[in-house]
Regions:
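Compact beta-sheet-dominated domain cores in extracellular/mature segments
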Residues: 1-382
Length: 382
């Protein structure tokens, strides 16, 4: 099996010995042992509209003989991973695929393609994905006008930020980046309709790639917006409470603020009685809500690093009362960054970033000069 290269606008990219382009898949961005049989995300069981199989659209490059590196490919980078009793070729640990949309040698129709819950890219001799210059623009969605990228094929994919990220810093790596592919670029991203060019920046990720930022916030796509046949403007990742990523995911407004939509606060049973919680995203994960002892009525003292570990419960407009909660006790306060935070009996409400999957993981937690307590439906901190 010969793996060689050809020239492209991105640099030299990997191809088969017969000149067919080779691709990598963001869904494979998780640690695995190349010696063990594993179930890779792109399988014959992963079917899109019309029961189209992922491996039918993106056939794995199988190791049919000794691996031979040519044309600048690094021999040490070639390897295999076992899948369904056959060996798939890898390059620097990432499985390689072909694309059925490439009808002839030299075609690169799978580049920057969104399908089967991930992004597909050509692979460079360095082992990094071939990324062009990305573009940011606004897109109308069910939640209103939000930030999107038209760079993917088919285009206009909604972009998200993670509450646990610091300014110009990402905390979403490894398995997280498989579910939330970062928006990458080969240089400074371009500003499309409705986007301020001065707000666009980049950060260098741990693997050396450049991720786009907007107003200092790293931006991502969501794998479940990238399925085969998925339409532009999907916001399946909106208000998603993601325990694996330690934070809350939001779509991004044109001004760079997170867009939480309208938040509904409900009650749930606990060992401390009825306490407040929020159900977030399409996965309906429940998250306990907390109050902070230094706060006063409608005044939050949790800012900066505190607000990263204890994200404020945000809302767009007046929050709604769910089961067991009185609407008259809900309110809002305007934070220093312009976002609206939900209050209950005047108490500003927070999530605990490292326990965002229900339960009282952050109860009676001393931090940042105070103590965080769960909030009862009666407004007490317990």
């Amino acid at each position: 099996m010969v793996v060689t290269t050809t020239t492209s606008k991105f640099g030299r990219v990997l191809v088969t010995g017969s000149g067919r382009s080779l691709y990598v898949f963001t869904g494979d961005n998780f640690p695995f042992s190349a010696k063990s049989a594993i179930q890779l995300p792109c399988t014959a069981l992963n079917k899109g509209p019309g029961k189209f199989e992922c491996t039918a659209a993106w056939p794995p490059l199988l190791a049919t003989g000794p691996l031979v590196a040519r044309g600048g490919v690094r021999q040490a980078g070639l390897g295999t991973v076992t899948r369904n009793h056959v060996k798939q070729v890898t390059y620097f640990g990432r499985p390689l695929y072909r694309f059925v949309g490439d009808a002839a040698a030299g075609q690169k129709n799978g580049q920057n393609f969104a399908a089967f819950d991930g992004m597909w890219y050509l692979d460079l001799t360095s082992g990094r994905s071939a990324i062009g210059v990305s573009t940011l623009q606004t897109e109308r969605s069910a939640n209103g006008v939000v930030l999107a990228s038209p760079t993917a094929t088919p285009g206009r994919r909604t972009l998200y930020t993670l509450s646990f990220d610091g300014k110009n810093m990402t905390t979403c790596t490894g398995a997280c980046s498989a579910l939330w592919p970062p928006l990458l670029t080969s240089g400074r991203a371009k500003a499309g309709a409705g986007v301020s060019r001065s707000a666009i920046g980049t950060i260098r990720r741990s693997n050396g790639s450049l991720q786009v930022t907007y107003h200092g916030h790293p931006v991502y796509m969501f794998a479940f917006d990238l399925g085969a046949g998925a339409k532009p403007g999907l916001t399946n990742g909106q208000y998603l409470i993601d325990a694996a990523a330690s934070g809350v995911w939001y779509t991004v407004l044109p001004n760079g603020r997170p867009d939480p939509g309208t938040t509904t606060v409900r009650s749930e049973s606990s060992s401390d009685g009825k306490i407040l919680s929020v159900t977030g995203g399409f996965n309906h994960a429940r998250a306990t809500l907390y109050g902070f002892t230094p706060d006063t009525a409608r005044v939050s003292k949790c800012n900066g690093q505190c607000a990263i570990f204890w994200p404020p419960v945000l809302t767009k407009g007046r929050p709604k009362a769910g089961a067991g909660v009185s609407q008259s006790h809900l309110g809002t306060l305007r934070r220093s960054d312009g976002t609206l935070q939900v209050t209950y009996f005047g108490h500003p409400l927070y999530f605990f970033a490292q326990a965002l999957n229900s339960g009282l993981g952050g109860d009676a937690f001393p931090a940042f000069g105070g103590i965080f307590y769960a909030v009862t439906v009666g407004g007490a901190l317990v």
